[in-house]
């Protein structure tokens, strides 16, 4: 086998090898609201935490995908909103060599799970800057959420 043929074969195998790497993490948007400040600081603090998650993804280049993890945290105290934090944590991921199902799973579960610690840290930082006690969100099983989402989609299409 010639050197050229070996090189082409190696390049073909490399192109088919699944690859997923994070190129960049960025904060796309962040918002903090504390509608009852400063009166809220005079009340006994018994927070009720509400959490909403959403993910978006889109292809932005050859094998390059933007994934955005959107998190909204609403904290109520005695039934009134103490604060609201909205974060859009973005990431650029280079993904190749995956079939459509694997790609969908990577974009819907793996990439958001990778972004979550960054979003959690940004949420915690802004809450503390708002003069509230630190909030450390518990880890989230994005694989389970992804499977649940698929099951809902399948149930809707069979109806």
From Swiss-Prot:
Gene Ontology MF annotations: unfolded protein binding
Coiled coil feature spans: none
A single cellular component GO annotation: cytoplasm
InterPro entries per the UniProt record, alphabetical: SecB, SecB-like_sf
Gene3D superfamilies: SecB-like
Protein's cellular compartments: Cytoplasm
Broad class of the protein's primary localization: cytoplasm
Keywords, sorted A to Z: Chaperone, Cytoplasm, Protein transport, Translocation, Transport
GO biological process: protein folding; protein tetramerization; protein transport
Keyword Cytoplasm: yes
Similarity section: Belongs to the SecB family.
NCBIfam families: PRK05751.1-4, secB
Function: One of the proteins required for the normal export of preproteins out of the cell cytoplasm. It is a molecular chaperone that binds to a subset of precursor proteins, maintaining them in a translocation-competent state. It also specifically binds to its receptor SecA.
Oligomeric and partner information: Homotetramer, a dimer of dimers. One homotetramer interacts with 1 SecA dimer.
HAMAP family linked: SecB
Name the record gives this protein: Protein-export protein SecB
Organism: Marinomonas sp. (strain MWYL1)
